[in-house]
Structures are given as C-alpha cells and as structure tokens.
C-alpha cells in the first residue's frame, strides 16, 4: 500500500494564498473604485438619494431626529452646543472650504490661473455664471421681501459633481475642457466665499473677531518664518475656527483663511506642504465630508407638493437660475471674451463642448444647498424655505447635469475641433 505523501509548506501555502486573495478582493475593488475620477460624485449621489428616500418614507421622523440630535464639545469652561446638522454645516464644511482654499491658492500660484491671459477666459465665464443666475432669481422674486435673500443660491457650482460627470464621459471630454471647467469652478468658489463673507454674516462679536484676528496673525507668522510642519497650522486653525464661529462670521471661512497661510513653495526635497495637504484631504472630502453634507441637506419631503410647488418664486428662481442662467452667463461671457480677442479658445475644445460645460456649471447642488442654508436661516419657522430651496436646487442641478451629459455623450465626432496647425 502506497503511503500518501505529507503536504509540505508549499502545499499548504497555495490554498491559504487563495483564501487570502479572495478575502482581499472586496478591499481591492473598493480601492479601485476610489481611484475612479467619478467615484466621489457617485458616492455623493447615493448619499443624497438616500436622504430623499428617507424623507419620503415612514423613516422621516428618525431622519429628522438624527439631524436634530444635540452634540456638545466641552473643554473646561468653554462649551459648544449645536444640533448635528449645524455641526455638519459649520464644522465639516469648514474642512471642505479648507480644500477649496488650497485649490484656489495652488491654481493662482502655479496652476492654470497663474498666467493672466490664461486666467481671463475662465474668470469672465465664472463672473457671467454668477451674475446672470442671480439676476434671474432677483427678477422672479422682485418685490417679495425676504425671498430676495436667496439671490446667491443659483450662483454657485458644485465642482465635485461637475467634474464627476466629465469623468464618466472618458475621452469624449478632452483634458482642456476639464481644465477649463476646473478653473471656472475654482473662481466660482472664490466668488461664493466673498458672497458668504459680505452678505451672509450675522451680528458681529468684536471680542471674538479680535481673537480670530490674533489667531490669523499667528498663522501668517508661521508662514513668514518658514514653518513647514502642518501641526502648528492645525492647532491655530482650530482656534481660528472657534473664534470665527463665535464672531458671527460664518465658520467655514476659517477654512479658507487657514488654506491661504499653508506654504506652497517646495523644499529642497521637492515637497510642498500645500500640495501634500490637498492630496491628503481630497479623499476625506470626496468620500466623507460631501456625502455626509448631501445626506444631511438633500432630504426633500414631497408630501403635500403639487405641480404648482415648482412655480413657487424661490423654487422657480433657483431652478431657472441654475439651468438657464448658468448656460447663458458662462457660455455668453466665454463667447464674448474670445470674440473680442481677450482670450483664445482652449486647444482641442469646440464651442459645442463649451456650451455643454456651461450646462454642467448649473450643477449647484452642495454649494447651492449650503448657501441656501444661510440665506433664510434667520427667518421664523413659519416662513422657512428649506423645502422650496432644496426642490429648486435638485430640479436645476439634475436638469443641467442630464442635458450637459447628453450633449457631450452624443456630440457627433465631426463637431469636434481639428487640432491647430503649428503655424497658426
């Protein structure tokens, strides 16, 4: 009778390696998904869709109770008490605006906005894309008193969503178009920051502003003295955020202020603190901050709504501002800028593609919802406009995204521009 040979280490290793490989497959798949350009937008859509489902189901009371859950941070005699929704809007969104500030600084110092002539086309397009939607909203809500506070809601662009749509299109969206959209959205974000600072600031606390100024001076000093470690910036940034929160100025602006003090220039090893922080924050914002914000703010209950609800001044002003205003403002300003010789068309981009891009700029979503949460926050409960704001943002953003995507997806190849000759 022949003895069965014992299994050596290599014999055991094969099935063990196979089991480990199978166990790691979900993690590998998750990592591959997170590397997709459109992944952040997909997660944001899923979180927002979940909010809509919960808001129109028996779970609505639990959803609302979750957002109203009181959360407190107490350090000695100092304490901050807020419902969970405000921690998300004031706290997590400060991290988002920190990332926005880093992107703005990088683009102006060493990116596509560092050259004045290159920056002029996206700058003019962004300004047009803010002014025209605001005018449409004001025109629809003229004479409506407090409703005019929402004029800036359709002026915003959600860069994460817009770039996510372009990423889904692959080669049908040329790199130059992505660069142009990014530049327009960055300048649009800068405009939104200015609008929040100037028009959506409550009564000011002088003492808190003085302390915030001292914290900001400390951050500037760190930069001037060449401090490149991020820990000191984080500590002073947290102090600045608390002071700004207590001052009456919206706390998210603290994130922008911190970003502008982070060193950009690389060291002898070629490492830039700003670029490293931007890289580290990107996934946290794309897969954490924005989906949580979308989940907390996109819930719209359709109970009691009728077709006439769409025609309410706030809803109609936002929806038309995003869908009609953005495409007129962005495309019109871009066309005039090129027509008068102030800037050149980007290499390899057609007017049809720029028109589609102007539609994608009408995806206001997270930024529009955020400004909407500020525009009417001081009104009494019986005059709340949360539902009309959310409905208008959803209608305008979804319509803009759908039509912009369809144009780029089915644009005939013959409409694509021919490469410029070297002599032109």
Model-derived regions: residue spans:
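Transmembrane alpha-helices that form the ion-translocation and gating core
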Residues: 124-163, 319-376, 395, 399-409
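Transmembrane alpha-helix boundary signature
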Residues: 54-66, 79-85, 99-115, 131-152
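Hydrophobic transmembrane alpha-helices of secondary-active transporters
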Residues: 77, 81-110, 260-262, 285-305, ...
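Functional cores that coordinate and move charged inorganic groups
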Residues: 166-263
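Entry/N-cap segments of selected transmembrane alpha helices
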Residues: 107-135, 205-214, 302-328, 351-355, ...
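Structural signature of hydrophobic alpha-helical transmembrane segments
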Residues: 86-97, 145-160, 201-214, 250-257, ...
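Predominantly late transmembrane helices and immediately cytosolic-facing juxtamembrane segments
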Residues: 15-32, 36, 53-56, 69, ...
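Hydrophobic core segments of alpha-helical transmembrane domains in multi-pass membrane transport
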Residues: 43-56, 96-102, 132-137, 215-221, ...
């Amino acid at each position: 009778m022949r003895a069965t040979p014992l299994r050596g280490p290599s014999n055991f290793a094969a099935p063990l390696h196979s089991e480990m490989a199978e166990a790691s497959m979900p993690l590998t798949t998750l990592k591959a998904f997170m590397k997709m350009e459109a992944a952040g937008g997909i997660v944001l859509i899923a979180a927002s869709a979940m909010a809509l489902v919960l808001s129109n189901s028996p779970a609505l009371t639990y959803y609302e109770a979750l957002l109203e859950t009181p959360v407190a941070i107490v350090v000695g005699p100092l304490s901050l008490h807020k419902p969970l929704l405000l921690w998300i809007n004031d706290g997590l969104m400060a991290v988002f605006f920190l990332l926005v500030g880093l992107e703005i600084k990088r683009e102006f110092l060493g990116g596509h906005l560092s050259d004045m002539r290159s920056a002029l086309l996206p700058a003019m397009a962004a300004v047009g894309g803010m002014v025209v939607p605001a005018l449409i909203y004001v025109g629809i809500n003229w004479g409506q008193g407090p409703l005019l506070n929402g004029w800036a809601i359709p002026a915003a662009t959600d860069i994460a969503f817009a770039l996510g749509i372009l990423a889904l299109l692959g080669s049908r969206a040329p790199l130059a178009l992505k660069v142009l959209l990014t530049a327009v959205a960055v300048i649009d974000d800068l405009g939104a920051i200015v609008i929040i600072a100037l028009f959506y600031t409550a009564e000011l606390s002088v003492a808190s502003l003085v302390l915030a100024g001292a914290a900001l001076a400390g951050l500037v000093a760190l930069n001037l003295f060449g401090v490149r470690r991020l820990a000191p910036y984080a500590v002073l940034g947290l102090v600045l955020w608390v002071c700004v929160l207590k001052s009456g100025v919206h706390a998210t602006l603290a994130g922008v202020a911190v970003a502008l003090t982070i060193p950009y220039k690389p060291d002898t090893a070629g490492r830039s603190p700003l670029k490293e922080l931007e890289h580290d924050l990107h996934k946290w914002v794309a897969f954490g901050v924005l989906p949580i914000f979308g989940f907390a703010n996109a819930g719209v209950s359709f109970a009691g709504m009728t077709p006439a609800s769409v025609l309410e001044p706030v809803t109609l002003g936002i929806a038309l501002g995003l869908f009609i205003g953005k495409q007129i403002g962005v495309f019109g300003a871009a066309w005039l800028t090129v027509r008068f010789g102030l800037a050149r068309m980007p290499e390899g981009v057609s007017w049809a593609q720029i028109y589609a891009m102007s539609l994608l700029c009408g995806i206001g979503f997270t930024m529009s919802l955020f400004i909407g949460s500020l525009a009417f926050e001081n009104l009494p409960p019986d005059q709340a406009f949360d539902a009309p704001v959310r409905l208008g943002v959803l209608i305008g953003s979804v319509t803009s995204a759908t039509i912009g995507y369809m144009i780029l997806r089915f644009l005939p190849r013959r409409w694509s521009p021919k490469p410029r000759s070297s002599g032109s």
